Amino acid sequence: WEEPPYPKPGEYYLLTGKVGQHTQFATQNNQLLHKYEDKPRIWVHTSVAKTLGIITDDLVRVTSLVGEVILAALVTEGIRPDCVYMAPGYGHLSKGLVTAYAHGASDSELHMTFTDPISGGQALTQTFVQLEKA
């Protein structure tokens, strides 16, 4: 067993996960679902947001060692102060996806490549990000 890395001060675990209104993120170009979904935001704990001067719907620059995105914030008590959350599957680059094109930001732009030694899957909780008001 190896001790996992921990975020340094000013860094946060980048978490991602599924959202209820989409099926495996293959339905994000569906106009009806798009109409009724909330816009993609990065969840930021209230205490962190206060320190950084961020309020809900402010644009936030999210930076990792491999990339950077800008998206709106959702300030909430519903996440730990050492974590941020982005719904994956957004930030499509294909202009053929006329509804989903350029909607939100892609978490893939931020994730570092870590392979879980047991399952061979990508270890998605070992990417750390920094936040600043954009």
Where are these regions (language model features)?
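Long, low-complexity segments enriched in small/aliphatic residues
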Residues: 1-32
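Long, contiguous, secondary-structure-rich segments that constitute the structural scaffold
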Residues: 27-43, 47-134
